[in-house]
């Protein structure tokens, strides 16, 4: 049930001097749209047609009239675009751009977990494989997870997968008792509570803003919790001038562009490393994006049976997001 992809040896192609111009030319030639997640490197964000979180990117993928979708993100995002657009060419610059959270929920094991709770419906966070989506009743994102769970009858048992931290946050916000799959994101679990508290002492006027994939002991220090889009909006609307940002630091590029006079401090990891950067998101770069468009590969392909099954819960999410 896993999505399959095709590769090409990208070493055979020369790289033009002006990648921005070359990519712009290919966009016109292919009638392509470039969708990029906030966690991508700044150059990719700057050349993208749309930058957003998982919900916004899903909505754009569903709406686009482009013939080619170039997805600057990780593979579950590109899979979602393909699920919504079976007749379009969907490209992912680097097929190794996976997701630790999606990998934490193997389909075979999740199938057994689901079978152990036959009366429960499955609400799956969009950060999962096409195979898990196909086993789900409703998909959600960090933007709409609380809203979606609130719309489910209170007497209906719910399995929430794969992110246990987002699941705990949804439980807290809704008062619902969810059956949680124990998955997590390596980036959002690497932030150091001790170092963030120390940062707050050093920057007493700064507000701590955090993504709900962070662990509960960190979220309790946050002045605001939200999806990447919600964090971005909050920084724009807040009167405060300094923020400690507890999510992947790629979002700070957009924060600085929209609020250049404000100061944004990346939340530190437990170790002295760049572990607060997603290693999968950072596999993409302009060169790979150009080569993907030039060669029309790597292409995302999903077995039709899996795609059709995965489409239903995604459509349900999109419907509930507008109610």
Swiss-Prot record:
Pathway: Cofactor biosynthesis; NAD(+) biosynthesis; quinolinate from iminoaspartate: step 1/1. GO terms for cellular component: cytosol. Binds 1 [4Fe-4S] cluster per subunit. Keywords: 4Fe-4S, Cytoplasm, Iron, Iron-sulfur, Metal-binding, Pyridine nucleotide biosynthesis, Transferase. Its EC number is 2.5.1.72. Its cofactor is [4Fe-4S] cluster. One of its GO terms (molecular function) is quinolinate synthetase A activity. InterPro entries: NadA, NadA_sf, Quinolinate_synth_type2. It is found in: Cytoplasm. One of its GO terms (biological process) is 'de novo' NAD biosynthetic process from L-aspartate. The keyword 4Fe-4S applies. The keyword Iron-sulfur applies. It catalyses: iminosuccinate + dihydroxyacetone phosphate = quinolinate + phosphate + 2 H2O + H(+). Catalyzes the condensation of iminoaspartate with dihydroxyacetone phosphate to form quinolinate. Belongs to the quinolinate synthase family. Type 2 subfamily. This is Quinolinate synthase.
């Amino acid at each position: 049930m896993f999505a399959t992809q095709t590769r090409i040896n990208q070493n055979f192609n020369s790289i033009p001097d002006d990648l921005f111009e070359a990519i712009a030319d290919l966009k016109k030639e292919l009638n392509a749209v470039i969708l990029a997640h906030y966690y991508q490197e700044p150059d990719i964000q700057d050349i993208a047609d749309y930058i957003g979180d998982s919900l916004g990117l899903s909505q754009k993928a569903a709406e686009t009239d482009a013939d080619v979708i170039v997805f600057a993100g990780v593979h579950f995002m590109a899979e979602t675009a393909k699920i919504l657009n079976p007749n379009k060419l969907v490209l992912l610059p680097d097929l190794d751009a996976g997701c630790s959270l999606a990998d934490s929920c193997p389909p075979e094991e999740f199938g057994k977990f689901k079978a152990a709770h036959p009366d429960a419906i499955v609400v799956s966070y969009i950060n999962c494989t096409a195979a898990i989506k196909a086993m789900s009743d409703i998909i959600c994102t960090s933007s709409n997870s609380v809203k979606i769970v609130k719309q489910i009858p209170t007497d209906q048992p719910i399995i929430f997968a794969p992110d246990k931290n987002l699941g705990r946050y949804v439980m807290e916000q809704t008062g619902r008792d969810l059956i949680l799959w124990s998955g997590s994101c390596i980036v959002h679990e690497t932030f150091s509570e001790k170092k963030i508290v120390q940062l707050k002492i050093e920057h007493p006027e700064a507000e701590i803003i955090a993504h709900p994939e962070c662990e509960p002991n960190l979220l309790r220090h946050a002045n605001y919790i939200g999806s990447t889009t919600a964090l971005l909006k909050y920084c724009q609307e807040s009167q405060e001038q300094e923020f400690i940002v507890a999510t992947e630091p790629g979002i700070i590029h957009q924060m600085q562009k929209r609020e250049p006079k404000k100061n944004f401090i990346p939340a530190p990891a437990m170790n002295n490393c760049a572990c607060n950067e997603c290693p999968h998101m950072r596999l993409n770069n302009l060169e790979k994006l150009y080569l993907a468009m030039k060669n029309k590969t790597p292409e995302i392909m999903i077995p039709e049976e899996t795609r059709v099954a995965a489409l239903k819960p995604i459509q349900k999410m999109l419907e509930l997001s507008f109610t």
